[in-house]
Amino acid sequence: MKSLWRRSFFGAQGRIWPVLLAIAVILLFGCQSREAPLSPGAANFKHEIKSCLTNLSVTLIEPVVNKDLPEIKAALEKVESPAAKLCRLCPFEMGVTDQSGATLAVYPAKGDGKGKDYSNYELVKKAIKSRKIQQQRFFLQDGSQLYLICAPLLRGETLIGLVAIAVSSEDAAKRWGLTEKEFMAIDFNS
């Protein structure tokens, strides 16, 4: 009787490994813990960034389609007040690129004011490929960090460009209590 039971479940050789493997797979995928909910500060940060990106996207679609640089700069300046409210006294920067990652405009303008080519940046490549909001931390030469959020500008299903916001990690920590781990865990697409 015992050998009949063993053969019916484990085969003629009595091998138990397929059953153990199946149980391990079920336990591995079925018992994973869920991500912890966002802290109130991280939730506020997400809400404010998404709101700013939505306002920027609506304002920038036509100027980016027409590659109207003065109008793009004017649109960024118009959105400045909500963006400044976004992070009072934070050094922030907003940028707009075309669909390949070449910079069309940056606000506030810094340095020579000339457009840079960000097409080789991993964050830009991911945002272009996925057509979803992507984020990344970026280290500056002085060792400080920026939190970068890059969102696609879509007209229908067509990618026309990207809009990006950079916020100092130090100021984000002061304003929202946002840690690097929390920033990287935020899903800006939900």
Description of each model-found segment:
Residues 69, 73, 108-139, 178-185:
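Extracytoplasmic/periplasmic sensor domains and loops in membrane signaling proteins
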Residues 77-130:
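Extracytoplasmic ligand-binding sensor domains of the Cache superfamily
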Residues 97, 153-154:
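Core beta-strand residues in small-molecule sensory/regulatory alpha/beta domains
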